[in-house]
């Protein structure tokens, strides 16, 4: 064995020991699949569900995804086969009942209560659901009645949601960060009879919002024993009455009105039926049985479940054999990861950015910082070669392997050490960041979806060859096409039917032949992989008529070590500009390393010449990838970040561009775009 091969094999052995890899995930250091450790063997045989589905073995994998020109429209279209239509009586309650029948005494949810982690089996959860559902019936909740729900991601969220679904109610989602005005708008738009909030702080906010809500009859606070009170009332409701209600629910019944984050005076409520969520939930386990039928696999939920993405993932995992851990919050995410050790994770790019920044900050600017920077380049170069050639060269593989025991393995351990499939969605992920994580052995895959598509409508299945910048193929049961103007359009059984009480918005959202127009721009390659290139509403048209997509430019500027956010502007303006915010935690050590006052205020840092020069370097790099007309000619560094608290970011961590422009309109008009004299 050569010295290179011996060194590489030694690194492989260290990597396998650290990752405990299973057969689902081949580590990129080597080409041949390792012998599978006992810990993650496929000893568990896929379990047949009681909801009628074709087993994945019946599918012809070579024909699952078809990409072709639609002869009727001439548009490039790609489709992935999904499950056949569900029975008329299928409901979300069936997902939980089926899990209990298959794995009743095995863990379903594990969550933190005080200082202790509590595990609830599928049978115990179903009993909880039935008890709360009976209580809701006692409260007078009729089939089709709306319940507005304001709660953080928690066991209480899943329990309350499932109970409302069981008795045929309609859950109207409220983010835990929503304002009193937004609460009022959602309660009134949904005609909610009941408002359930998680804690006393939310109750105070709700009390100040509901005076003008004529439909509302009750407000219940979970923190002060609200769910126990509901259960107590439910003891007067018979099993027969509950069963009658459960059996009355059909797949076409409305089950939820999901309000898009950032709703204001005119909220857009997306109507979802039981069929939408059940189709999504049942399609993925059938498509990826090796991952989702292994009982030893786990997932950690921490994204807001008021968002359709996180909620759909919960239903998907309930329909599988995977165990669910619920994080106590973003602040405790790292410690929660060490408990859950998830094999599956659903994240937004902002989370991965934070993980990367924390690792970079910990490495510092000395020798460790040099090693980390070299490891980043090695991982990215590795994935670039894999993307271009299907395989990295021997020297590139060896360089990458050298950093595995000293850098990459630590990064994987931060994420729990067992990750097989991490899906990033909700916003574009910087391709350089994706290449780093994939090259480091962190299996990050991009996906794409919207509230209107019950979240995922495109995804990269486990083991998908690396397609840099692609959000994957059509999700099972979906068809995607690209319109003449580049807009992505979607069709499938999980696409929403309408916006609640908003016929005008509904009509504008669908084409004449029934495809949902997403508002996103993209392209589909010959293999059926979708690439997002921008958003129609974000598309900047300068005063000179140049069309500019801000996303790629923003991604490069945000690679600056201490930049938190970059917002590229210039619509109907003479040139392209950018607003830049600072990540204070990353900024302090950078200032110290440069011999500057690390305790200077953010206002001073925003004006500091060295800080501006560093940002300018990244602006210059971004400009190298675009034409002169698309180049950022001027930028302003702001002394505050765009956050949910100041109303400039949604709960799903997307910057609200119109609100930023409005907030800084004076700054833009007097300093960025000064009129010529």
Explain the meaning of each model-derived region.
Residues 104-107, 221, 235-259, 266, ...:
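Conserved pre-ATP/AMP-binding loop-to-beta segment of ANL
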Residues 278-298, 305-408, 418:
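Conserved AMP-binding/adenylation subdomain of ANL enzymes
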Residues 2-61, 139, 166-232, 614:
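Structural core segment of the AMP-binding/adenylate-forming
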Residues 565-568, 574, 616-677:
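Conserved C-terminal "lid"/linker of ANL adenylate-forming enzymes
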Residues 474-542, 559:
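Conserved ATP-binding/catalytic segment of the ANL
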Residues 119-123, 255-281:
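Conserved AMP-binding A3 loop
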Residues 84, 108-162, 179-184, 231-235, ...:
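Conserved AMP-binding/adenylate-forming core of the ANL superfamily
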Residues 24-28, 201-251, 359-410:
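ANL superfamily adenylate-forming
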């Amino acid at each position: 064995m050569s010295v290179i091969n011996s060194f590489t094999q030694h690194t492989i052995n260290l990597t396998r020991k650290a990752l405990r890899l299973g057969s689902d995930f081949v580590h990129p250091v080597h080409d041949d699949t390792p012998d599978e450790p006992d810990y993650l063997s496929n000893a568990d045989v896929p379990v047949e569900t009681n909801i009628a589905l074709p087993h994945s073995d019946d599918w012809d994998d070579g024909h699952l995804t078809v990409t072709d020109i639609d002869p009727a429209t001439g548009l490039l279209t790609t489709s992935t086969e999904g499950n056949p239509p569900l029975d008329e009586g299928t409901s979300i309650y069936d997902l939980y009942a089926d899990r209990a029948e298959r794995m009743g005494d095995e863990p379903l949810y594990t969550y933190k209560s005080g200082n202790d982690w509590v595990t609830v089996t599928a049978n115990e959860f179903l009993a909880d659901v039935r008890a709360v559902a009976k209580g809701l019936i006692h409260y007078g909740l009729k089939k089709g009645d709306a319940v507005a729900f304001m709660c953080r991601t928690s066991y209480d969220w899943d329990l309350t949601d499932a109970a409302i679904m069981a008795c045929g109610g309609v859950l109207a989602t409220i983010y835990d960060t929503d304002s009193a005005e937004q609460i009022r708008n959602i309660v009134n738009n949904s005609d909610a009879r009941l408002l359930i909030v998680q804690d006393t702080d939310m109750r105070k906010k709700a009390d100040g919002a509901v005076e003008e809500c004529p439909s509302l009859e009750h407000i219940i606070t979970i923190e002060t024993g609200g769910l126990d009170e509901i259960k107590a009332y439910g003891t007067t409701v018979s099993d027969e009455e509950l069963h009658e209600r459960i059996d009355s629910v059909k797949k076409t019944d409305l089950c939820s009105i999901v309000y898009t984050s950032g709703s204001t005076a005119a909220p857009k409520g997306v109507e979802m039926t039981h069929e939408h969520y059940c189709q999504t939930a049942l399609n993925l386990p059938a498509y990826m049985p090796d991952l989702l039928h292994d009982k030893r696999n786990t997932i950690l939920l921490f994204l807001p479940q008021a968002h359709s993405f996180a909620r759909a993932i919960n239903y998907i995992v309930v329909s599988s054999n995977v165990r669910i851990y619920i994080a106590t919050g973003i602040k405790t995410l790292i410690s929660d990861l060490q408990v859950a050790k998830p094999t599956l994770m659903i994240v937004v790019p902002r989370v991965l950015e934070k993980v990367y920044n924390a690792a970079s900050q910990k490495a510092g600017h000395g020798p460790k910082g040099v090693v980390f920077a070299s490891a980043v380049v090695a991982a990215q170069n590795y994935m670039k070669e894999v993307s271009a050639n299907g395989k990295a060269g021997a020297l590139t593989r060896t360089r990458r392997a050298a950093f595995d025991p000293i850098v990459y393995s630590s990064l994987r351990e931060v994420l729990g050490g067992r990750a097989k499939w991490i899906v990033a969605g909700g916003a574009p992920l910087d391709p350089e960041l994706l290449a780093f994580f994939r090259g480091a052995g962190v299996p990050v895959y991009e996906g794409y979806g919207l509230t209107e598509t019950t979240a995922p409508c495109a995804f990269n299945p486990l083991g998908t060859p690396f397609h840099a910048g692609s959000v994957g193929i059509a999700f099972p049961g979906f068809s995607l096409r690209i319109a003449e103007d580049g807009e992505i359009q979607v069709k499938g059984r999980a696409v929403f039917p309408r916006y609640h009480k908003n016929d005008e918005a509904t009509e504008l959202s669908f084409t004449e032949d029934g495809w949902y127009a997403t508002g996103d721009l993209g392209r589909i390659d010959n293999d059926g992989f979708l690439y997002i290139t921008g958003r129609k509403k974000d598309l900047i048209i300068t005063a000179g008529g140049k069309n500019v997509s801000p996303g790629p430019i923003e991604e490069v500027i945000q690679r600056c070590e201490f930049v938190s956010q970059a917002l590229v502007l210039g619509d109907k303006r003479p040139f392209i500009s950018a607003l830049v915010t600072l990540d204070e935690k990353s900024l302090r050590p950078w200032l110290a390393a440069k011999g500057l006052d690390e305790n200077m205020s953010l206002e001073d840092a925003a004006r500091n010449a060295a800080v501006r020069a560093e940002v300018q370097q990244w602006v210059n790099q971004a400009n190298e990838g675009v034409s002169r007309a698309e180049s950022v000619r001027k930028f302003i560094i702001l002394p505050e970040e765009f956050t949910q608290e100041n109303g400039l970011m949604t709960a799903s961590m997307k910057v609200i561009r119109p609100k930023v422009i409005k907030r800084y309109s004076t700054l833009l008009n007097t300093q960025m775009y000064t009129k010529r004299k």
